[in-house]
Amino acid sequence: MDKEVLTLVNMLNDKYVHVYKDEHNNIIVDGTIIIFDKEYDEFPVKIHKVNGSINWYGHISSDPCGSLKSLKNFPDIVTGNVYIFNNPKLTSLDGCPKEIYGSLICDHCNISDISGIASKINNNFIASNNPISDISALENITVGGNIELIDTPWANAHKNDIKNASIIAEKNIQETIFD
């Protein structure tokens, strides 16, 4: 087995996920990747495509302690959702997949920089409970669903004066502040 493929197979340790290289030598993952607070702070090898979703959870407790700190080596394409929860070392979306067929959900991390966001998200972009204060990166992307920035500095600062899009901005209240 190829060394890069073996490295990823050992990391994932999931018999329901198939990892292989395509005819262009790109790493492809068939199946949903689920990572629960392992010692990894990023994927160890570059993945081209995941035919499924990525769920990278920090430790589910009152203390956020997830180990993910970089989206380096994340796939270029994800045919499902990308869900990153409770990873306070993650501060940026640099390395984010370029195209996500489902939703991108980054909740309870420490993301302040979204400039590396995917160019196309077919469903929702949710980045609640992060210190995001600048959303100008959203001007050049396609989001097929809602954008939710609940309990972020940006949402709190703009909840009364924003018009013309569909963003939910107030914690615990689904108030559409754009038309």
Indicate residue ranges for each PLM-predicted region.
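The feature captures the LRR N-terminal capping module
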Residues: 1-49, 53, 165-179
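Intrinsic-disorder/low-complexity detector
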Residues: 73, 121-123
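Per-repeat structural element of leucine-rich repeats
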Residues: 67-70, 89-92, 112-116, 133-137, ...
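Leucine-rich solenoid repeat scaffolds
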Residues: 127-179
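Per-repeat beta-strand-to-loop junction in leucine-rich repeat
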Residues: 85-86, 107, 128, 150
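LRR N-terminal entry segment and analogous cap-like coil->beta motifs
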Residues: 21-90, 95, 99-102, 106
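Short, conserved loop/helix-junction motifs that constitute active-site signature segments
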Residues: 98, 119-120, 140-142
